[in-house]
């Protein structure tokens, strides 16, 4: 690019003509391409130069994504909260209960019955 103001005016006029015709010069190649999508992008870039391409979106979006677990609404939050409580209850109940089904009991393994004297209430 030349730094002469007259040349700069000519270049800007050429760019405006290119935008109107729908043909755009690509930055990497010297040839002209006539793609309507590229011409629309070039028009928008010329109209709004302050809008840059941020690779991950806005700063607000990036901050929200970095915070961690998010819930869509209060219903999702309450369901996740209930799920967490039920997991804790199930785990604690499983730890306290005796494991059954490991072996088959035999009469020798069973505790002895206490001898009780059965008396009839009618006999008295």
From Swiss-Prot:
BP term (GO), one: G2/M transition of mitotic cell cycle
Keyword Cell division appears in the UniProt entry: yes
Where Phosphoserine occurs, residue numbers? 74
Q: Where is this region: Disordered?
A: 99-124
Give the location in the cell. Answer: Cytoplasm
Q: How is it modified after translation?
A: Phosphorylation at Ser-74 by gwl during mitosis is essential for interaction with ppp2r2d (PR55-delta) and subsequent inactivation of PP2A.
Q: Which residues form a coiled coil?
A: none
Name the residue ranges with Polar residues bias: 113-124
**UniProt keyword list:** Cell cycle, Cell division, Cytoplasm, Mitosis, Phosphoprotein, Protein phosphatase inhibitor
GO CC term (a single one): cytoplasm
Instruction: Provide a Gene Ontology MF annotation, just one.
Output: phosphatase inhibitor activity
Q: Which family does it belong to?
A: Belongs to the endosulfine family.
Task performed by this protein: Protein phosphatase inhibitor that specifically inhibits protein phosphatase 2A (PP2A) during mitosis.
Q: Which PANTHER family match?
A: ALPHA-ENDOSULFINE, ENDOSULFINE
Name of the featured protein: Alpha-endosulfine
């Amino acid at each position: 690019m030349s730094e002469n103001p007259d040349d700069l005016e000519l270049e800007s006029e050429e760019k405006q003509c290119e935008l109107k015709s729908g043909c755009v010069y690509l930055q990497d190649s010297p040839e002209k391409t006539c793609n309507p999508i590229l011409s629309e992008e070039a028009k928008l870039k010329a109209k709004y130069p302050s809008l840059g391409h941020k690779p991950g979106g806005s700063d607000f979006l990036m901050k929200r994504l970095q915070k961690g677990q998010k819930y869509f609404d209060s219903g999702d939050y309450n369901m996740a909260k209930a799920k967490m409580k039920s997991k804790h209850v199930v785990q604690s109940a499983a730890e306290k209960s005796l494991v059954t089904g490991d072996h088959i009991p035999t009469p020798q393994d069973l505790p002895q019955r206490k001898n009780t004297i059965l008396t009839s209430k009618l006999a008295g």
